[in-house]
């Protein structure tokens, strides 16, 4: 009983803290997020879905306003990039494989085994600078906690794919068989399933844990610059 009470208290405290921090961004967004969370907890799924969809729409509208110049810049550019044989496979564990849990080590081992002639590069905090540059303001926000490692990883993956192409695999993916060459033969590749209401904006139409494409694909160039624009202005 004490454990349950403690969990409830932690959840309520987290909800309150998130609401306070969200209010500094937008009161409407904060209210929609609370409604989504509370309705989901008491299984009012329809109301939760409504709040979630409105929250996503609000975010999309906000980003379209903030990134309007960048969107116009890339609106009419159609460049799918350059196909290269033996394009690399990218994996990231920020603190290094040596510090990773056994599960992650086994997954990375399986990836190395199943990629054939495609080189595997494991990116960490000591090796990223060999391949890409990360803006100082991003690293500063990572150090002070404003930008999480997951968000940094998002930037790293699109930067690598834009510059080198290849295939990004999350470090918790276990490869039980050889990776099909078809993954590398498309200018853009992602895992997907039939659209479903799942709480994610993608509705499973795309994923980022398996993501690939050709070097120089304008899609990744746009996303990379969008991340840079966003994090140069925002605090969370």
What is each residue range found by the language model?
Residues 164, 169-170:
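Active-site acidic Asp-centered loop
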Residues 1-153, 171-236:
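Glycosyltransferase-associated regions of secretory-pathway enzymes
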Residues 155-164:
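Small-residue hinge/turn detector
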